[in-house]
Curated annotation (Swiss-Prot):
Belongs to the eIF-6 family. Keywords: Cytoplasm, Initiation factor, Nucleus, Phosphoprotein, Protein biosynthesis, Ribosome biogenesis. Transmembrane segments: none annotated. Monomer. Associates with the 60S ribosomal subunit. One of its GO terms (molecular function) is ribosomal large subunit binding. GO terms for biological process: assembly of large subunit precursor of preribosome; cytosolic ribosome assembly; maturation of 5.8S rRNA; maturation of 5.8S rRNA from tricistronic rRNA transcript (SSU-rRNA, 5.8S rRNA, LSU-rRNA); maturation of LSU-rRNA; maturation of LSU-rRNA from tricistronic rRNA transcript (SSU-rRNA, 5.8S rRNA, LSU-rRNA); ribosomal subunit export from nucleus. Binds to the 60S ribosomal subunit and prevents its association with the 40S ribosomal subunit to form the 80S initiation complex in the cytoplasm. Is also involved in ribosome biogenesis. Associates with pre-60S subunits in the nucleus and is involved in its nuclear export. It comes from Candida albicans (strain SC5314 / ATCC MYA-2876) (Yeast). This is Eukaryotic translation initiation factor 6.
Length: 245
């Protein structure tokens, strides 16, 4: 399922939210439409946590995470950390990261298996990413840009990268990540795909300006046409097996 929404007239959905296969963070405040886009699809499946990070609402740019863990900058307050710990499943590791490049969502792009990171990220941060998120870490650029989290959107099914990424780069990144990639845009031609949308294995939410062709590229590369959350997919399969056995 691919949908569109806005956060207080901003189409940069990936700035104000962070979506994984086991939880979703959204900024506090904002309009009801923004939350209902997530709640309609995720409400019964994974927790949706309203929070600030380091006193700001740009939760998607300040954090990076996957189904195993969540990394937050060292400026995150104790109160915010406590709120996250209380709201997220116990299996999720939450870790403060002492990193000069503190907008972690801009410098890390990850799914449940691999992470692309800014070439200049600290060695300790690289180790934390591997440890907390349980992923292989690669220092990379995308179309010459060091902000890999801003110019790439990634799930376990596929990835969307900066429109100027060369075919050679796409093939190289695709073999590193072991998922198909396509170069494209969101929000009617914006190359900042990481900030313009969020995606997990069954849902993508992009900005309201995203055109129908852009949305169909998103649905196709992330294989969202008939994707179901694991929990629901499993239940349906069991029900069908019982019905026909």
């Amino acid at each position: 399922m691919a949908t569109r929404t806005q956060f207080e007239n901003s189409n940069e959905v990936g700035v104000f939210s962070n979506l994984t296969n086991s939880y979703c963070l959204v900024a506090v405040g904002g309009s009801e439409n923004f939350y209902s886009a997530f709640e309609a699809e995720l409400g019964d499946v994974i927790p949706i946590v309203h929070t600030t990070i380091a006193g700001t609402r740009i939760v998607g740019r300040m954090t990076s995470g996957n189904r195993r863990g969540l990394l937050v900058p060292t400026q995150t307050t104790d109160q915010e950390l406590m709120h996250l710990r209380n709201s997220l499943p116990d299996s999720i590791k939450i870790q403060r990261v002492e990193e000069r490049l503190s907008a972690l969502g801009n410098v890390i792009c990850c799914n449940d298996y691999v992470a692309l990171v800014h070439p200049d990220i600290e060695r300790e941060t690289e180790e934390l990413i591997a440890d907390v998120l349980g992923v292989e870490v690669f220092r990379q650029t995308i179309a010459g840009n060091v902000l890999v989290g801003s110019y790439c959107s990634l799930s376990n099914q596929g990835g969307l990268v900066h429109p100027q990424t060369s075919i050679q780069d796409q093939e190289e990144l695709s073999s590193l990540l072991q998922v198909p990639l396509v170069a494209g845009t969101v929000n009617r031609g914006s190359s900042v795909v990481g900030a313009g949308m969020v995606v997990n294995d069954w849902l993508s939410v992009a900005g309201l300006d995203t055109t129908a062709p852009e949305l169909s590229v998103i649905e196709s590369i992330f294989r969202l046409q008939d994707a179901q959350p694991d929990a629901i997919g499993g239940n349906l399969r069991d029900t069908l097996i019982e019905t026909y056995s």
